[in-house]
Amino acid sequence: DEFDIAYSNALSFSPSKHVLIERYMTSKEVSLFYIAIDGEIHLTAMGNRYVKHSQNGVIPLPVAYFFPSQHLDNYLQHLNEKIIKMFKSIGIQNGIIFIQSFVENGECVIYEMGYRLTGSLEYKLSTKINGINPLEMLIRFALTGKMTDCKTLPEPHFDKPAANITFLAKPGVIGEIKGVEQIRALPGVIDLIFTYLAGEEIPQKAVGTLAQVILRVFIVSETKEQLKQTMDEVHRSIEIHSTTGEDMLLPTFDTHEL
């Protein structure tokens, strides 16, 4: 019954009166990032994208990213050159590209891509690790027409493990945020970015969208074990309550998944 309703709804918006039905997938996910400089395309990072199924009837949303992905070598061997060839075939010269993909039986099944920076701000991690800032490159390109003079480009095999913890919140008015200074002082935390502050409202229409993201914390550590310890401490430190005293945070990432 749900399928029939969804099919009729989709058909009503189709000028061609055809509906594309995709296979529903629940596989693990990865995100990939490319930089295009004067027609040359370079893979700069590949990370695991972890999502949480914590709300009924909406798509799962990200709760963490981990770099580098254990799937990187396999991707470089089997798919990277084909992806670069595809980008070149459509004339991409300069810019930032991201790809989101499922990983099924060791193979990437791509479902989304964009020709821009991402809202996940992963460039903060790559900038810390390899010193090249994609945001600054785009600003420079906008002002001068040239992305960079740097001869050494980022290498996707990060020499340190890195993570982006993403906190999701329920709709409501934010009353109080605790733990910020404790998180800033943790070893390896390089930045944290709030999308809402105390007194602001997360609307009901945000449910099931990235508008539920309230905080991102960026961490670079010397070892994977140190990274996990810092991530756990971040989760323990942060508290966000509504004006009525309700805990607004949705279930967070479990570092045992790393």
Language model region names:
Residues 22, 93-105, 150, 249-254:
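A short glycine-rich, hydrophobically flanked beta-strand micro-motif that places a catalytic Asp/Glu
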Residues 23-26, 34-92, 96, 103, ...:
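ATP-dependent carboxylate/phosphate-activation module, predominantly the ATP-grasp catalytic core
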Residues 21, 43-46, 110, 192, ...:
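Generic preference for hydrophobic
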Residues 139-258:
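Peripheral (often C-terminal) accessory segments that flank ATP-dependent C-N-forming ligase machineries
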Residues 8-15, 37, 51-52, 88-92, ...:
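Generic secondary-structure signature for well-ordered alpha-helical cores
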Residues 103-109, 208-211:
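A short, glycine/Asx- and small/polar-enriched loop/turn
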Residues 1-45:
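Rossmann-like NAD(P)H-binding beta-loop-alpha module
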